[in-house]
Every structure is written in C-alpha cells, then in structure tokens.
Regions:
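Conserved class I S-adenosyl-L-methionine
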Residues: 1-38
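C-terminal alpha-helical "lid/dimerization" subdomain adjacent to the S-adenosyl-L-methionine
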Residues: 145-188, 192-195
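Short conserved loop adjoining the S-adenosyl-L-methionine
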Residues: 98-107
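A short His-aromatic
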Residues: 120-122
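Core SAM-dependent methyltransferase catalytic element
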Residues: 194-216
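Class I SAM-dependent methyltransferase SAM/SAH-binding core
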Residues: 44, 50-99
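A conserved beta-strand element that flanks and buttresses the S-adenosyl-L-methionine
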Residues: 114
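A short glycine-rich, Lys/Arg-flanked "PGG" loop and its adjoining helix->strand segment in the class I
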Residues: 128-140
Length: 216
C-alpha cells in the first residue's frame, strides 16, 4: 500500500496546521532541554517534516550538526528551504518503513536521535525494529527522544484528544499505547527510559544508550 504522505496536498495541509497543535511547543521545549547532556554533537531527525524540531535543537546547541530525513516531497521541499543557507544540516530522502541506513553520512554514531509526530505512522513490528536500529546508530551516552502521539487508554479520551486537536483520525496512524513502547525501548537496549512529558495523547518518550561498564 503506497504511503499516503507522498500526497502533496496531505503534507501541505499538515504543515499548515502543525504550528498550532495544542501544547506541542511545550513538549518540544522539554525535549530540547533533555538533550543537554549529549549535545553539542551529531543529530538525526527521523521524519523531520519541515525541520521545525531540528531548528529548535540547533538554536539551543548551535555547534551541533544534523541530518534530516523524510520521504514526503512536500516536507523535503519545506526542510530544504528552511535550511538552504545552513551548512550544519544535511537532508536525505528516506522512508521509515525501510531499515535506517548505516553508510554515507550515517556511518558515524549520532549523539542524539530525535523525532516528532512521525513514528506513529509505522506498525508496531516496525516500531520495534526501528528502535533497535536507532540504538545501533547512537553513540554510548547518546539520547533518543520522540515526541509522539500514543494510543489513549479509552475511546472517550481519544475522542476528546481529537476534538481538542481539531482533527479527524488519519487512516495512516498506527498508534500504540505508551507503556508497551517504553518496554520496546528498553528491549532495544536503552536505559533511563521514561515518558518525561505528556499532554493527553501527545507524549515525550526518551532513553539513553548506556556507556560501557568498567572492565573486570
């Protein structure tokens, strides 16, 4: 089934609404501050959209560099325009349904892997394999931080979330509950896994790749 985010009209409609999503900026602020222990350094933004989150991270940690990946032509046009004069940013086309690359600009570890409102578009099996790939790309001590839509515990809470968002359900959504996702992050090898901020179905999930312990 083709990925619906290649549809230019759908992507442009999302971009027109995305800056007004309730409490998004609050969650982004918590995410940016959570990276203080691992940046400046190399950042990978998964499903970067128009580059909004990368721009916030680079504003806070200006000595960092970033690779932004997305598969939507409209999103790639928007992020390319945003960073046209910023040589700290590399932009690449990649579908999160496919395994993350480990060659070219991806052949060195990242200090942080970030994502916002993207990973919920892949199914649960792919989420789990993606988390393992993220851990493999992180340097020891690196952080994965994901500001994500999670499945609400009840339909009533889900309906209220959608009402406050002013949006309908998207057939491309593959929402998973928060608690299993925290477990998948631990299973992938991350430590200090937690949900460190949440507003209704919008949750900030994070974990740190452990550093090697002392040799015996």
């Amino acid at each position: 089934m083709p990925n619906s985010w290649v549809d230019v009209d759908k992507a442009l409609d999302y971009l027109a609404r995305s800056d007004t999503l309730p409490h998004r900026a609050e969650g982004e602020g918590v995410l940016v501050r959570d990276l203080a222990g691992c940046l400046p350094g190399r950042v990978l933004d998964l499903g970067c959209g128009d580059g909004r989150l990368t721009a916030l991270v680079l504003a806070a940690y200006p000595e960092s560099t970033a690779i932004c990946i997305d598969m939507s032509p409209a999103m790639l046009d928007a992020v390319t325009e945003r960073f046209a004069d910023d040589d700290r940013v590399t932009i690449a086309t990649h579908d999160l349904e496919d395994p993350l690359p480990f060659d070219g600009p991806f052949n060195r570890p990242f200090n942080a892997v970030i994502s916002s409102l993207a990973i919920h578009h892949v199914d649960d099996e792919r989420k789990r394999t993606l988390y393992a790939e993220i851990v493999a790309l992180l340097t020891p001590g690196g952080v994965f931080a994901n500001l994500e839509i999670v499945r609400s515990p009840t339909q009533a809470l889900h309906d209220r979330w959608r009402d406050e968002m002013g949006a309908r359900d998207d057939p491309s959504d593959r929402l998973a509950p928060m608690e299993p996702q925290l477990g998948w992050l631990r299973d992938a090898g991350l430590h200090d896994v937690d949900c460190i901020w949440k507003w209704r179905a919008l949750a900030l999930l994070r974990g740190t790749k452990p550093r090697p312990g002392p040799s015996m």
